[in-house]
From Swiss-Prot:
InterPro entries: DNA-dir_RNA_pol_omega, Pol_omega/Rpo6/RPB6, RPB6/omega-like_sf
Organism of provenance: Caulobacter vibrioides (strain NA1000 / CB15N)
Full protein name: DNA-directed RNA polymerase subunit omega
GO cellular component: DNA-directed RNA polymerase complex
Family to which the UniProt record says this protein belongs: Belongs to the RNA polymerase subunit omega family.
Pfam entry (one): RNA_pol_Rpb6
Group of enzyme by EC: transferase
Length: 119
């Protein structure tokens, strides 16, 4: 069997940087136990991933979307909870009745307490 080259893969994925990301992601998936789409032929996982890309046996867009979802660090559930908490605070007018002196004291105590916690 001929060795897979980057030129074979660049025809399928034109951006070399995207090719590296996709093939590395696929190789990690193979290491985690994903089913192989081509025969291994005693090749290592990165080579198998490149051969799968070159042979066009995997869905590039699906692989790209899965890669993006694994790289995202936003937890939508946490974001929704924070937004609900903010809306609840805005709906409660009791915290708006703080005097200027009380506000300054609260800010200073937060500032002073925050420095002690860091050390």
């Amino acid at each position: 069997m001929a060795r897979v080259t980057v030129e074979d893969c660049v025809e399928k994925v034109p951006n070399r940087f995207a090719l590296v990301l996709l093939s590395a992601h696929r190789a990690r998936g193979i290491s985690a136990g994903a089913a192989l789409m081509v025969d291994r032929d005693n090749d290592k996982n990165p080579v198998v991933a490149l051969r799968e890309i070159a042979d066009d046996v995997i869905d590039h867009e699906g692989l790209k979307e899965h890669l993006i979802s694994t790289l995202q660090r936003v937890d939508e559930h946490t974001e929704a909870e924070e937004e609900a908490e903010t809306l609840a605070l805005l709906a409660d007018p009791s915290h708006m009745q703080m005097s200027e002196l009380e506000l300054v004291r609260a800010l200073q105590s937060d500032r002073d307490g925050g420095q002690e916690e860091r050390y």
